[in-house]
Amino acid sequence: MFFHAMGVTGESSEPVAKYLQDRYFCILSTSTVYCKGQKYVSKADEVRQVEAYLKSQGVEHLELVVASSIGADLAMAFLTSTKLPIGYVFFDGGQFAQIGKGTRRVMAPFLYLAIKSLYWSKGGTLKKILWCDDDSIKPYFIAAGENLTYTNLRRQLSDSLEDKPFPSLPEELQKQIYFEFGSIEDHFKYRQAVMEAYPCGHYPVFEGYNHMQYQIRDPRGFAEMLTSIAEHNGMPKLPFIRK
């Protein structure tokens, strides 16, 4: 199951999922923030909707949960509330920021304009807010920007990335979680705090890589890495993993 990044739809995980779909049933959910005509109520409600969908599909076990960027915040809420057995978890550049309420309120209009501009410019402004502007990812930003409303984004930020201690996780679950960061991405600054909160987790660093770079630039390689984790509880020998 995939939890997507900010400013994109769930379809943004399709390039990776297509290399997994012959082996796994892949679920690519989209937050109500980016769904036309839907209202974001709360993080708890997002989790409720995910749980309801999984139940309706008869899902009794999740082999792997993959969460990218701010998707890590929602995935963590899911992990701490679900009763479903979970095999492994992979956080790609998880945005484990702890931001004060006032700052998040100030951020909302700027983020709204940034995401909407991607729709208005047909992806032309992507390089201004992300390290790359690959044509392969622009459609997901454009689709999200088209459906985004300021109210939904403001509501999401009201209960996401909160300035609170990280939720506790059982040691056994921590041992099944991979918290990956690129060494040159801005989110790398959260790594130490996450390591202190979850000392039993795995913390691979992709040397010289930016935010979600491996996933974006090499979805097949990224999918093969996820398969290695799910089937062998270990990272493959990638040349860019920090020794």
Task: Show the residue positions of the predicted features.
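Conserved HGGG/HGGXW glycine-rich cap/lid loop of the alpha/beta-hydrolase fold
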Residues: 1-36
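Flexible "cap/lid" loop of the alpha/beta hydrolase fold
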Residues: 80-117
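Gly/Ala-rich beta-loop-alpha elbow adjacent to hydrolase catalytic centers
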Residues: 66-75
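Conserved alpha/beta-hydrolase catalytic His-Asp/Glu region
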Residues: 101-102, 118-171
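Conserved serine/cysteine hydrolase catalytic core
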Residues: 158-196, 214-215
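Active-site loop/oxyanion-hole signature of alpha/beta-hydrolase fold enzymes
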Residues: 28-64
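Catalytic histidine neighborhood in serine/cysteine hydrolases
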Residues: 198-212
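Catalytic histidine-centered segment of alpha/beta-hydrolase-like enzymes
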Residues: 209-222
